[in-house]
């Protein structure tokens, strides 16, 4: 019973978040240096990282505002710089 309760609580919290936002940060394989933002599901914030310029994944946003909008983060919860 406790397991089911925990499962539904976790599922409910993750339900409203865009799936792309749950992907891990991925700097990509190239060696460029593009400042970008990603959603950190542990801190529940959009955080800055340096993108290499190719590959990577969809958890990669040009601006803090874009990351917050897509991932449903309130501005006062961000930013956290790496």
From Swiss-Prot:
Highest taxon in the source lineage: Eukaryota
Residues covered by the BPTI/Kunitz inhibitor domain: 21-71
Chain positions listed as propeptide in the UniProt record: 75-82
GO cellular component: extracellular space; nematocyst
Signal peptide per UniProt: 1-16
Classification via Gene3D superfamilies: Pancreatic trypsin inhibitor Kunitz domain (4.10.410.10)
Intrachain disulfide bonds: 21-71, 30-54, 46-67
Major localization listed first in the record, in broad terms: secreted
Keyword Disulfide bond carried by entry: yes
Family membership: Belongs to the venom Kunitz-type family. Sea anemone type 2 potassium channel toxin subfamily.
Misc. remarks from the entry: The primary structure of the mature peptide is identical to that of kappaPI-actitoxin-Avd3b (AsKC1) from Anemonia sulcata (AC Q9TWG0).
Protein's job: Dual-function toxin that inhibits both the serine protease trypsin (Kd=30 nM) and voltage-gated potassium channels Kv1.2/KCNA2 (IC(50)=2800 nM).
Protein name per Swiss-Prot or TrEMBL: U-actitoxin-Avd3f
Species: Anemonia viridis
Lineage of the species this protein comes from: Eukaryota, Metazoa, Cnidaria, Anthozoa, Hexacorallia
């Amino acid at each position: 019973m406790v397991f089911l309760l925990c499962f539904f609580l976790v599922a409910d919290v993750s339900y409203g978040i865009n799936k792309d936002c749950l992907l891990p940060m991925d700097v990509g394989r190239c060696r460029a240096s593009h400042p970008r933002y990603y959603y950190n599901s542990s801190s529940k914030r959009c955080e800055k990282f340096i993108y290499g310029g190719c590959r990577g994944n969809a958890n990669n946003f040009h601006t803090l505002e874009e990351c917050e909008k897509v991932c449903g983060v309130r501005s006062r919860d961000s930013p956290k710089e790496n």
